[in-house]
């Protein structure tokens, strides 16, 4: 009997392999070249183009165990995860597919045979649904399989429109579609619920375990259903559901995978009650988060990365709720790999990266989690009614990194509704503000619409004749311009590269007899290329022929920087890991800027390795080869694509030896040796999960190295040595400085002790207690604590308040001897004073410190101390 999830997966794939199906690996959770999908959410996703007739495989039968994620976008189960028996962010879909091979009878027979003979499920526990008018399916189930008529349930259009039914599948408004048949399992009458199609169908007694889709129509825009020439089959069975049945449990969270993960999470956090819903949330979320990172998604503030961030933060919040006091989530990865078996092969290969990324995100969120939860808790405690306003939800999102669904999760536990509409309004207002700021000083050309087309000749030439097809001035089409006029000139063909893919637009001239138009920038306007600039001499009109001449030096320097970004991208992936992907770039003649996904700062040793690797590839002088090919062929060759971009069916591929292959429309050097030298000038984080490297190449890199050498020699001269001795001499100077600082601190302690003897005489007695309140001039804040300790020793039973004002800041300290903390607490005392000087602070009952920003109020604040103490000592 197949019991474990791993055994069920193997049994399913082996059953269909033995029945002529090609076992195909699970595709990535990031759908390839399909921007309509946020994540892979069904087994058929990777075969979409096959079903549409746009792709052909060397097999007509396939079977998979597909990893899927449903969180964010149309298919979003996140809010329900942990609170129901069957909702998950991550699940595995077992499926078998026919591409114009077998159809209804074979598909139905395969499903029934696997369930009743391989898994030996009792037939009397199974019932099936079919589409209302699918008599063919009824005959197969009833006459050929032997399912009783009363156990075959017809489902009509139950979603308010023709063919809108639980039993009619559609890829979209048009395209392949058809009826489907679902197999249900009866958990028994001890669980509430009715058969599908009944008023009680939403109960948990009858659970759908397998959906068999018969793609037999091609839906037209008119709504007409035309028969497909080669009908196909798409099926799906959630492995978690069938595992629950085979393991004799009702909830998916009770199967082997989840039992293991829940137990491990409880052990790490220190929880004994394994029924906690928060443990379910954590166990579910580690699966989606770990596999998403393994497939190249990194936490960020946009797109797929933001969905990942939301899931991680929801898990961390539930861990916090259970009492977790340190990073715990990443520690579940080894257990996940172990329990997922063969399905975790890719995850095992990227385990170190996955753990680091999870830990970094968890630690980052932990810095704001407690404070954010405190603000949310206070808002909920003060709430009048049952709805939390959108402004508060937005503040938590904007300031403390709380995704709205995390706030909603907390509110749900207290039966509070979230004002989602108000949150969206606040979000829209922020977007408007950001857009307004971004548009400040925007050029009128940004909104220019040009209905023309320009051919690009700049891959092979930097000059050539062209005809002026349009001229735009101040956003309006004109027929001619005169000397001194600024304009956008459109040509029928141009060697000028228009800004795209991070590469800046070319500069140069358009010249003719007595005419010179200086091109300061080149931009794309739809299919047209616009040459932005000013007419230096002569008159220029539409229809005129000009010589288009690109500035060769600037283009050459830009090409050096563009080509090296490809080498840099490949080197980063080799040194840091294959999770690295390009997030943006800027390539101009002076420098390059490359943004990439990574969860932590790049170490100096790693940067050095990256730089050396790039320079090695430069010295190898690879020839740069470009080729036009189909997108699928390019991806099969391993071409890197910008994450989530939509590409045309034909793409341009740039290859540099066996080191780099990318999709790119930019201009490049002929050989990597042309780059000369690559030098990184800076590396920094620009957003959560996004790093930026700035660098220079060629002559600019040589100049940078020369400047560094000059500065090194200048430093050596200041240290009275040479370049080779700078480090040793600097270390000696730092050691000497530390010793001087130590001696200075000792001297300050002695001075404080001497000063304390003078200050003792300033103490007054209040109800038998020594009270010393003093504003000190010329005393550094770092000396206050030592001085307070000395005064306590001398005064024995005492209350002390000292304050200094330096450089626009106030520093305060309060000390209370142990015999008096029952009446006066140092934390309360110093907080009272700090509030009057624009500050805050606190500490222990016997000693507390504070700061402030209003030194002009210090005298008045200290004057309030004696009455405050007197009142408490009365």
From Swiss-Prot:
Its main location: cytoplasm. CDD domains: AlaRS_core. It comes from the Bacteria. Binds 1 zinc ion per subunit. It is found in: Cytoplasm. GO terms for biological process: alanyl-tRNA aminoacylation; negative regulation of DNA-templated transcription. HAMAP family: Ala_tRNA_synth_B. This is Alanine--tRNA ligase. It comes from Shewanella baltica (strain OS195). The gene is alaS.
């Amino acid at each position: 009997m197949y019991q474990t999830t791993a055994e069920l997966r193997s049994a399913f794939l082996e059953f269909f392999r033995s029945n002529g199906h090609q076992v195909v690996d699970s595709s990535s959770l990031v759908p390839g070249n399909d921007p309509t999908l946020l994540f892979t959410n069904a087994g058929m996703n990777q075969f979409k183009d096959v079903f549409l007739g746009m792709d052909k495989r060397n097999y007509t039968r396939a079977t998979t165990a597909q990893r899927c994620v449903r969180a964010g976008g149309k298919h979003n189960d996140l809010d329900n995860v942990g609170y129901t028996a069957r909702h998950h962010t991550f699940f595995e879909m077992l499926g078998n597919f026919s591409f114009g091979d077998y159809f209804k009878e074979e598909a139905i027979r395969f499903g029934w045979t696997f369930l009743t003979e391989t898994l030996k499920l009792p037939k009397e526990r199974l019932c099936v649904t079919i589409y209302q008018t699918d008599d063919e399916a009824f005959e197969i189930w009833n006459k050929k399989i032997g399912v009783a008529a009363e156990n075959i349930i017809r489902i009509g259009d139950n979603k308010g429109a023709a063919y809108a039914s639980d039993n009619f599948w559609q890829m979209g408004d048009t395209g392949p579609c058809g009826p489907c048949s679902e197999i249900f399992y009866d958990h028994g009458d001890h669980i509430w619920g009715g058969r599908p199609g009944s008023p009680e169908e939403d109960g948990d007694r009858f659970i759908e375990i397998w959906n068999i889709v018969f793609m037999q129509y091609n839906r037209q825009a008119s709504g007409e259903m035309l028969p497909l020439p080669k009908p196909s089959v798409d099926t799906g069975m959630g492995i978690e559901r069938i595992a629950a049945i085979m393991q004799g449990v009702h909830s998916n969270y009770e199967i082997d995978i989840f039992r293991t993960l829940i137990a491990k999470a409880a052990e790490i956090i220190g929880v004994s009650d394994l029924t906690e819903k928060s443990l379910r949330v954590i166990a579910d979320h580690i699966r989606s988060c770990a596999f998403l990172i393994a497939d190249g998604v990194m936490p960020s503030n946009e797109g797929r990365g933001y969905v990942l961030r939301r899931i991680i933060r929801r898990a961390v919040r539930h861990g916090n709720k259970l009492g977790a006091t340190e990073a715990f989530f990443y520690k579940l990865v080894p257990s996940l790999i172990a329990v997922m078996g063969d399905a975790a092969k890719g995850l095992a290969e990227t385990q170190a990266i996955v753990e680091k990324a999870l830990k970094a995100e968890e630690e980052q969120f932990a810095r704001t989690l407690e404070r954010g939860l405190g603000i949310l808790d206070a808002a909920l405690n003060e709430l009048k009614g049952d709805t939390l306003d959108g402004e508060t939800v937005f503040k938590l999102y904007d300031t403390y990194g709380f995704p709205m669904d995390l706030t909603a999760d907390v509110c749900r536990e207290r039966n509070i509704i979230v004002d989602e509409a108000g949150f969206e309004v606040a979000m829209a207002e922020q977007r408007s503000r950001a857009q307004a700021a971004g548009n400040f000083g925007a050029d009128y050309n940004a909104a220019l619409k040009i209905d023309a087309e320009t051919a690009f000749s700049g891959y092979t030439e930097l000059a050539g004749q062209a005809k002026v097809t349009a001229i735009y001035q101040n956003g309006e089409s004109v027929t001619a311009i005169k000397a001194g006029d600024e304009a956008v000139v459109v040509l029928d063909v141009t060697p000028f590269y228009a800004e795209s893919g991070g590469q800046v637009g070319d500069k140069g001239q358009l010249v003719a007899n007595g005419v010179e138009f200086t091109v300061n920038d080149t931009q794309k306007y739809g299919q047209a290329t616009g040459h932005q600039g000013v007419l230096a001499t002569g008159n220029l009109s539409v229809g005129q022929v000009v010589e288009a001449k690109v500035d060769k030096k600037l283009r050459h320097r830009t090409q050096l920087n563009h080509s090296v970004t490809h080498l840099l991208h490949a080197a980063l992936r080799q040194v840091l890991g294959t999770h690295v992907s390009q997030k943006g770039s800027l390539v101009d003649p002076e420098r390059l800027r490359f943004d990439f996904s990574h969860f932590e700062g790049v170490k100096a040793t790693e940067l050095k390795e990256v730089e050396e690797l790039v320079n090695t590839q430069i010295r190898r002088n690879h020839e740069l080869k470009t080729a036009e090919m189909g997108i699928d062929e390019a991806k099969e060759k391993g071409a890197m694509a910008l994450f989530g971009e939509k590409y045309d069916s034909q793409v341009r591929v740039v290859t540099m030896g066996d080191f780099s292959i990318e999709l790119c429309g930019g201009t490049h050097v002929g050989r990597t040796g042309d780059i000369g030298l690559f030098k990184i000038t800076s590396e920094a984080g620009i957003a959560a999960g996004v790093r930026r490297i700035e660098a220079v190449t060629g002559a600019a890199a040589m100049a940078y190295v020369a400047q560094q050498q000059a500065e090194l020699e200048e430093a050596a001269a200041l240290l009275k040595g040479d370049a080779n001795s700078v480090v040793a001499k600097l270390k000696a100077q730092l050691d000497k400085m530390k010793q001087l600082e130590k001696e200075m601190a000792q001297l300050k302690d002695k001075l404080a002790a001497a000063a304390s003897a003078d200050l003792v005489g300033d103490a007054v007695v209040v109800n038998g207690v020594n009270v010393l309140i003093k504003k000190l001039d010329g005393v550094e804040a770092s000396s206050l604590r030592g001085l307070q300790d000395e005064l306590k020793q001398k005064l024995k039973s005492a209350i002390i308040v000292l304050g200094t004002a330096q450089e626009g800041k106030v520093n305060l300290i309060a000390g209370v001897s142990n015999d008096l903390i029952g009446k006066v607490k140092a934390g309360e005392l110093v907080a009272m004073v700090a509030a009057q000087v624009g500050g805050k602070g606190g500490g222990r009952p016997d000693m507390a410190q504070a700061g402030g920003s209003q030194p002009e109020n210090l005298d008045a604040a200290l004057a309030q101390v004696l009455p405050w103490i007197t009142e408490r000592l009365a």
